[in-house]
Amino acid sequence: MPSATSHSGSGSKSSGPPPPSGSSGSEAAAGAAAPASQHPATGTGAVQTEAMKQILGVIDKKLRNLEKKKGKLDDYQERMNKGERLNQDQLDAVSKYQEVTNNLEFAKELQRSFMALSQDIQKTIKKTARREQLMREEAEQKRLKTVLELQYVLDKLGDDDVRTDLKQGLSGVPILSEEELSLLDEFYKLVDPERDMSLRLNEQYEHASIHLWDLLEGKEKPVCGTTYKALKEIVERVFQSNYFDSTHNHQNGLCEEEEAASAPTVEDQVAEAEPEPAEEYTEQSEVESTEYVNRQFMAETQFSSGEKEQVDEWTVETVEVVNSLQQQPQAASPSVPEPHSLTPVAQSDPLVRRQRVQDLMAQMQGPYNFIQDSMLDFENQTLDPAIVSAQPMNPTQNMDMPQLVCPQVHSESRLAQSNQVPVQPEATQVPLVSSTSEGYTASQPLYQPSHATEQRPQKEPMDQIQATISLNTDQTTASSSLPAASQPQVFQAGTSKPLHSSGINVNAAPFQSMQTVFNMNAPVPPANEPETLKQQSQYQATYNQSFSSQPHQVEQTELQQDQLQTVVGTYHGSQDQPHQVPGNHQQPPQQNTGFPRSSQPYYNSRGVSRGGSRGARGLMNGYRGPANGFRGGYDGYRPSFSNTPNSGYSQSQFTAPRDYSGYQRDGYQQNFKRGSGQSGPRGAPRGRGGPPRPNRGMPQMNTQQVN
């Protein structure tokens, strides 16, 4: 019985809790239904969110209580299973264990349902808020558009034509009356007031914005003798009339006619303006063609402005030279050809003259400038008689292009001038030798530059710059008719040679013309330039030159080689004992060689030093004297110079003759071949066939004739 009673008691007790739980579940459902029913009424997402949070909080609290109760019942059940005795209350609680478990499961399921519902509500709230935001933006945009339209209409109402059209209407029905137009004018003064400096701009337009807002809202507030609602209806009537949707011309057709009449005028102006670009293009093409014709990549106007003075100066000098050539006596010799007179076409046609000068300048850019720079600077140079010994040119190297052959100049008219003697610019110039040199001597047929266009502006006339040409004995018949190629200041371009050649061709015309003033037998100056200047200033103090004029020109039809050859003096002693060597300086005959080699018995036993200039190799191989060991120099050899007969040039003896120690006057060549024999560490003397000398002192030299 007690057990039954307890069981029944427990059963009765267990049957008791479900109603509270059921009541709690119904309350929760009612609470959930209440917000659901209140959702459409409230319409605010914040209230819905707050209610959902409260419902979820109540459910969580019920779940915690049921879990605690279930935990106690589990403990009681375990104690009963162990055989312990429980009191009546504990036994009643154990009897309600199944009810508590069912309520707990129901609460959990309800919590899950409310959680899902809360999420759906949150999504709905977000969507609603977004929709409301869009609707609000659309409403604001619509309001702003209405405000802009209202301002436009109020501005256009100030036009009399618009006011008349609105009074008359488009189809005869008036849109606005005069009273309504007056109301709109008064309202325009409120929404667009004149600037009142007593108020701030923000305050002044704040009042205007209130009037606009009330008009858009259509409030019943009085304004301008009426209300905002009435004004809003008037404005909406104007908008619905669509009067301002189309453009209206109020010039009664005059504006359209003027536009139609002005259109052909504009077209005519465009048609007249079209040929102008064509003319400009034609002018540009002419300028470009001028650039190609001149071959100087300059326009003709630029060229004429830049080169006019120089061309005029060349023309004047050309005329002077031609006149001086024509005035010379031309009956000196029967073999003298008649000079070609320069036709003065260049004066009558400046364009042809300038083109001819350009063509010649283009052909003579390279070697022409070099020869002019090296050959025409005669004013500041000193005359060195040891250098003035002309070598003949090869007369076969003539230019095929037409040249002006100058007549043979009378010796009396030419030799009377003291500045007509060609001078070697520097002793350090590279000497050149002719391939057909035999025994040459100076003769006096003098030649002037032939081509006038190749002259450069100088301080003195070009006819004063002359060169003495040595003639060969077997060329006496053509001695007076040599072409102008022998002039050092005239450039002759061979047709078979390129204008700009990197190598040096000794047979070319410019270098053949250089042979008239370069001497192969000239002593090479020392490598030290201060010594050269010192020596030069020392001997120039006692140097004098004189010129003798002859009444008639002496023709040298045949010159014998035996009359001109002299025996080179010997060299004896040391530096303290100078010896004078008389005689002319003559090139030994060489045949069939471009650069002949002659024996040089006065060199020392050592080979030629390397690395030095060609003209200074003889100096590098000077003797080392027994006294002071000086190597090379000018202070041992003192020659006296005698001039060739009938040369028109005489020279007094040196009062302080020059000394050239350890140096040979004649027979020195710069382009000798090196010897093949070996003698000691340095080998045989390079370029000389003799055996090496055992001694390095000052040897005793014997007289030897150079052939």
UniProtKB/Swiss-Prot annotation:
Compartments it resides in: Cytoplasm, Cytoplasmic ribonucleoprotein granule; Cytoplasm, Cytosol; Cell projection, Dendrite; Cell projection, Lamellipodium
Composition skew (Low complexity), residue ranges: 1-15, 22-43, 325-335, 475-489, 674-684, 695-707
Location of the region described as G3BP1-binding in the Swiss-Prot/TrEMBL record: 358-379
A single Gene Ontology CC term: dendrite
Region of interest (Disordered), residue spans: 1-48, 325-347, 412-496, 526-558, 570-707
Function: mRNA-binding protein that acts as a regulator of mRNAs transport, translation and/or stability, and which is involved in neurogenesis, synaptic plasticity in neurons and cell proliferation and migration in multiple cell types. Plays an essential role in cytoplasmic stress granule formation. Acts as an mRNA regulator by mediating formation of some phase-separated membraneless compartment: undergoes liquid-liquid phase separation upon binding to target mRNAs, leading to assemble mRNAs into cytoplasmic ribonucleoprotein granules that concentrate mRNAs with associated regulatory factors.
Coiled-coil regions, chain positions: 58-92, 123-151
Similarity annotation: Belongs to the caprin family.
Entry protein name: Caprin-1
Organism of origin: Mus musculus
